[in-house]
Curated annotation (Swiss-Prot):
It comes from the Eukaryota. Interacts with cns1. Transmembrane segments: none annotated. This is Metal-dependent phosphohydrolase cns2. The lineage of its organism: Eukaryota, Fungi, Dikarya, Ascomycota, Pezizomycotina. Cordycepin and pentostatin biosynthesis coupling is an important point of metabolic regulation where pentostatin safeguards cordycepin from deamination by inhibiting adenosine deaminase (ADA) activity. ADA is not inhibited until cordycepin reaches self-toxic levels, at which point ADA derepression occurs allowing for detoxification of cordycepin to 3'-deoxyinosine. Keywords: Hydrolase, Lipid droplet. It comes from Cordyceps militaris (strain CM01) (Caterpillar fungus). Pathway: Secondary metabolite biosynthesis. It is an enzyme of class 3 (hydrolase). One of its GO terms (cellular component) is nucleus. Disruption phenotype: Impairs the production of cordycepin.
Length: 345
């Protein structure tokens, strides 16, 4: 039995023997994993790499926001679909849904993505997977290569503003870490979680069985968006960091392949070493000045405005319905928030 190792802010992993791993998550509790494909994936270098990557890029790396990691989020999404009874392939898809994320996460979108392009890690996912052992690992265990297409698994990915494991885990993990949602309320959300009509039907949905719990979650999600995800000051730091990275990659001073090979800390050291004096001053300003005053900063047109409208399936009802239908006041509140953020562009 090994000692527990940190996967991030709210999660540890412990290898009990060669055949099982105990995950302890402050939101979800304990989860014992013994399926061979999951144990092998959890121990793989490709999955473990995500421990060194902050969900929130430069703000996480510099300690401005909590250092929530891509690893704890990926494992969290896996736990959520597992808890509602998802098939093994959907559990694998959840675990691997962020596997191609680069160092500094979405900062790289501001550095290297072309206008109108999707997130850099999604556009280059196939390219990255070819350099890994992951396709061979899942094939060895009889799992389809479709697990690398998480959009095929409705419990893992659904269009916004619906609930899915990816969206729900980062909502809970970030809202708790940033103090926007009490741990007790986060755990009530998990207790309220269900799959409709079941976890294995073709048109399956993640739903909550309590409208008040869904409302608490949705409001915390909106608050986290306003203060963190679409905070113009945080986005400004992403853009400034992205400019330096883009210049260094374009000049050939940093190879883009290293984006999948090093941790945030290692990459930051590489940037400092490769930077010219002007770029080094820009890096030092990011390190010393922190989050800029957001007075006068506008929300960029490319910035997502994130809201949640989870499906609610009260016990005894035949069909779920969006929270905005169950509680029309939430529909009005949500639209008012979207309008208020749009006016800041």
């Amino acid at each position: 039995m090994s000692c527990p190792t940190s996967a991030g802010v709210l999660q540890t992993h412990q290898l009990l023997n060669d055949n099982s791993i105990l995950i302890r998550d402050e939101i979800y509790g304990e989860e014992l994993v013994s399926e061979p494909v999951l144990v092998e994936l959890l121990q793989s270098a490709e999955v473990q790499r995500l421990q060194g990557i902050c969900q929130h890029g430069v703000t996480g790396f510099l300690g401005i926001t909590p250092r929530v990691t891509r690893l704890e989020h990926s494992v969290g999404a896996f736990i959520l679909v597992r808890r509602v009874g998802a098939a093994l392939d959907e559990q694998v898809a959840a675990l691997l849904h962020d596997i191609s994320h680069t160092t500094l996460s979405h900062v790289i979108d501001h550095a290297l993505s072309k206008p109108g392009e999707g997130s850099y890690h999604e556009v280059h996912k196939a390219r990255y997977l070819k350099t890994t052992r992951l396709p061979d690992i899942v094939a060895k265990h009889g799992i389809s290569q479709k697990v690398f297409e998480e959009e095929l698994f409705p419990l893992v990915e659904m269009p916004s503003p619906q609930l899915c494991a990816d969206r729900l885990d980062y909502a809970l993990r970030d809202a708790v870490s940033f103090g926007k949602l009490a741990m007790e309320d986060a755990q009530k959300v998990v207790s309220s979680l269900r799959a409709f009509p079941s976890a294995t039907t073709a048109r399956r949905l993640l739903v909550l069985d309590d409208a008040e719990v869904a409302l608490t979650l949705s409001r915390a999600y909106t608050t986290t968006d306003k203060d963190v995800w679409s905070n113009p000051a945080h986005i400004d730091m992403y853009e400034r960091t992205g400019r330096v990275i883009g210049e260094l990659v374009e000049a050939g001073s940093v190879e883009d392949k290293v984006l999948w090979q090093v941790s945030d800390a290692e990459f930051w050291t590489m940037l400092r070493q490769a930077a010219n004096p002007e770029q080094r001053r820009a890096i030092e300003r990011l390190e010393t000045e922190g989050v800029p005053e957001d007075d006068g900063l506008e929300l960029p047109h490319c910035a997502k405005i994130r809201t949640l409208d989870p499906d609610v399936w009260p016990r005894g009802e035949k069909q779920p319905a969006p929270l905005s239908i169950v509680l029309p006041t939430w529909g009005t509140e949500r639209q008012q928030y979207i309008l208020s953020r749009t006016q800041h562009r």
